[in-house]
Amino acid sequence: MKNELNGLIVPSITPFNADYSVNLDRIETLAAFFKDNGIKGAFICGTSGESLSLTTEERMAITTRWVEVAPEDFSVLVHVGHNSLVAAQALAAQAQKAGAWGIGAHSPTFFKPNNADALVDYCAQIAASAPKLPFYYYHIPGATGVSINIIDFLRAARGRLPNLCGIKFTSPNMMEYQLCREFDDGKYDVLFGIDS
């Protein structure tokens, strides 16, 4: 699948109320602010969005709200990764039903895949739950503890992950990043962003 995001995509925060509940109303303000500042899309419920601190229901509500208030021509890319494969599949299916532009998922962070084939198996089961959406593997080894070589992952994904369109590359390994960009004649969209 060749879909490509264009322009600046922001890894959005999740707004909270003083009582730590999610403030769904503020999402519209964020979306308008991003659009007014030339941002072309948002990666929601990722690490900046505190996904692993949220319940599955909260993440679904955030996805629904973002899709409802997203400006025209604004891409909503939803992180659906979870330590529970069943929860990740439910998040993926809900993102597709809500009308998100695409989904992404990082590896499990507790019972971790130990090779590229196992990681592809995990991602394929999530991506199959939203087969109409572009899927990005969220490579963030500093947070997940999974540092499987991404070129090995891309090779293993051939024919097994049909809606894989790219990598959200969150690692300081610039050599690996460049190899990803060049892999299969630039077939995959490789989004780069890392906090320092």
Can you say where each PLM-predicted feature lies in the sequence?
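Active-site beta->alpha loop and helix N-cap motifs at the rims of alpha/beta catalytic domains
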Residues: 2-146
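Catalytic alpha/beta core domains of metabolic enzymes, predominantly
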Residues: 127-131, 140-196
